[in-house]
Amino acid sequence: MGSIGAASMEFCFDVFKELKVHHANDNMLYSPFAILSTLAMVFLGAKDSTRTQINKVVHFDKLPGFGDSIEAQCGTSANVHSSLRDILNQITKQNDAYSFSLASRLYAQETYTVVPEYLQCVKELYRGGLESVNFQTAADQARGLINAWVESQTNGIIRNILQPSSVDSQTAMVLVNAIAFKGLWEKAFKAEDTQTIPFRVTEQESKPVQMMHQIGSFKVASMASEKMKILELPFASGTMSMLVLLPDDVSGLEQLESTISFEKLTEWTSSSIMEERKVKVYLPRMKMEEKYNLTSLLMAMGITDLFSSSANLSGISSVGSLKIPQAVHAAYAEINEAGRDVVGSAEAGVDATEEFRADHPFLFCVKHIETNAILLFGRCVSP
């Protein structure tokens, strides 16, 4: 499964570079892993250059066994699709330690005949699978149905993923992908230690935020050459943790963003660099929800055929003109004090000399510990 982690990390930073162009000073939140798994679902039925483009952009071409035929991909257990399924099953199963809801599905115009093997395969591997709806004569009802499904899958959190007029009678296919995350820390922050303090959005501007605080032993690294610090906070599940990448300076985010990459993050978070130390941690409460048009994002990254008349999705349906004109990704994350073990009050461990104070813009990610797959990646400019 490790190679999937590498692919998702590489893809994560490719997406980040592209989103940054259009969201220069905004909060950002997306799930590289969820987008990757959705593209894997499409990849199963893509042919020719449509397939080659997905292969390249999502780095599947570097993974063993990914290019096999649909029969081979569904029939074997030791391949990438089943590894993706195993991670998805692990992170989305009912758990007291966190709630991680994923809604990912393809919707096709009901008059198109879908290849039975494809239907069977995506159902088996990707739960959401493919659903037929009537865009042709009831586009708005179809939109309502899709929105209701995403809302129910994310426990009411992500609503109206498809905006009015995003589908019409000409729509052949829509791809929706949404993720909602609420985590429980391994070590809780005590609510009474949370205080309202200024968060410095820029050198000139600040805003009051609810700043959580605790003192504890955490993996941390100070990178003098990169002018930043990294902190790892484990979630109670034991399967995930959150990395916070904090520039030393209020205006240091730009430098961090221009240097960060799959290779760099792997190096920075290696056991030779990060070590467990006693730290005073200050982290703002966060509630973030972002929505992105995947069509324009993926086209800019090199997946162009899928969204145009050049698309070859003959592994999904024999209809010659089938393409995906509309693809949307939504992500939600809530970070607060809640945790499994309540440690003593922050004042009890005043012997910690090191401080990690996230009171200015930073990057963060939620990762799957076993595989290093990046489940969520975010930029917090203004909590």
Curated annotation (Swiss-Prot):
Its main location: secreted. Major protein of egg white. CDD domains: serpinB14_OVA (cd02059). PROSITE patterns: SERPIN. GO terms for molecular function: serine-type endopeptidase inhibitor activity. Keywords: Acetylation, Disulfide bond, Glycoprotein, Phosphoprotein, Secreted, Signal. The modification N-acetylglycine is found at G2. Disulfide bonds join C74-C121. The keyword 4Fe-4S does not apply. Residues 22-48 form the signal peptide. It comes from the Eukaryota. Glycans are attached at N293, N312. Pfam families: Serpin. The signal sequence is not cleaved. The functional signal for membrane translocation of ovalbumin becomes accessible when the nascent chain is 50 to 60 residues long. The hydrophobic sequence which lies between residues 27 and 43 folds back on the preceding residues to form an amphipathic hairpin structure which is the signal element recognized by the membrane. This is Ovalbumin. The gene is SERPINB14.
